């Protein structure tokens, strides 16, 4: 029984391979290679007196009697394979086209983002330049046609704002002082010694270089927030001028601060 089933299987495989070889030349490569065992079996099947030969002939007649059934059974499988291949090819082409479209989309998005970033940076620089130009218009510059850089403009604006703040605080301090000493001190801070000497004419000495500072960097050991210093090159007579006068000299003078001292 084992020999019969093996022979039938071999014959069926040969018939299937023959049908496939006639259908497509590519299937000819799938034919099995002959061996010595196969040749011996073929010889036994061809002998007319042997039992295996009779059984092989019957099996061969049965297979030849229904060639359409074997071909019909093999053709649907091959057709299915061709259909799968046809389906795979469009899917591959679609994948390639999708990849190309995706790369183009990514490049387009990157270009759009870069253009938007450039526009934002350009607008920011325009706004910054416009703001600095408006700041230069309100800052006092000497000469007026001097062109300041951005850093110089910001530093000068900082110093100018600080000077205005100190001037306002000095005016408040002058308004709060009711004595003649506060008025004279304010006059010493706001007026130059040369202008005061030219107006009074009490001393013929030349004007000295006074410097009154009220900055955060002033020394901490001073009792007053306002510190006035005299340069070494100035004469000593100017120190006597800035000292407050004796009380009997201004006995009948009203002790009121001058209007120019509070400006």
From Swiss-Prot:
Pfam families: HLH. Residues 112-164 form the bHLH domain. Residues 20-76, 197-253 are annotated as: Disordered. One of its GO terms (molecular function) is protein dimerization activity. It comes from the Eukaryota. It is found in: Nucleus. One of its GO terms (cellular component) is nucleus. The keyword DNA-binding applies. Transcriptional regulator. Involved in neuronal differentiation. Activates transcription by binding to the E box (5'-CANNTG-3'). Efficient DNA binding requires dimerization with another bHLH protein. This is Neurogenin-2. It comes from Mus musculus (Mouse).
């Amino acid at each position: 029984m084992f020999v019969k089933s093996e022979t039938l299987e071999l014959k069926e495989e040969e018939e299937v391979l023959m049908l496939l070889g006639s259908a497509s030349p590519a299937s000819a490569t799938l034919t099995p290679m002959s061996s010595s065992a196969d040749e011996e079996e073929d010889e036994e099947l061809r002998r007319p007196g042997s039992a295996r030969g009779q059984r092989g002939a019957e099996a061969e007649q049965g297979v030849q009697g229904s060639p359409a059934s074997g071909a019909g059974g093999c053709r649907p499988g091959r057709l299915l394979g061709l259909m799968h291949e046809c389906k795979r090819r469009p899917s591959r082409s679609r994948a390639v086209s999708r990849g190309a479209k995706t790369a183009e989309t990514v490049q387009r998005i990157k270009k759009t983002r870069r253009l938007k970033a450039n526009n934002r940076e350009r607008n920011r620089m325009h706004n910054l330049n416009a703001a600095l130009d408006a700041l230069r218009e309100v800052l006092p510059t000497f000469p007026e046609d001097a062109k300041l850089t951005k850093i110089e403009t910001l530093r000068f604006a900082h110093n100018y704002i600080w000077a205005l703040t100190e001037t306002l605080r000095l005016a408040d301090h002058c308004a709060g002082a009711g004595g003649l000493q506060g008025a004279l001190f304010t006059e010493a801070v706001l007026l130059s010694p040369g202008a005061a000497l030219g107006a009074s004419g009490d001393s013929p000495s030349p004007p000295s270089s006074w410097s009154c500072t009220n900055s955060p960097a002033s020394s901490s050991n001073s009792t007053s927030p306002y510190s006035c210093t005299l340069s070494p090159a100035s004469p000593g007579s100017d120190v006597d001028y800035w000292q407050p006068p004796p009380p009997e000299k201004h006995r009948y003078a009203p002790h009121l601060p001058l209007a120019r001292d509070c400006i």
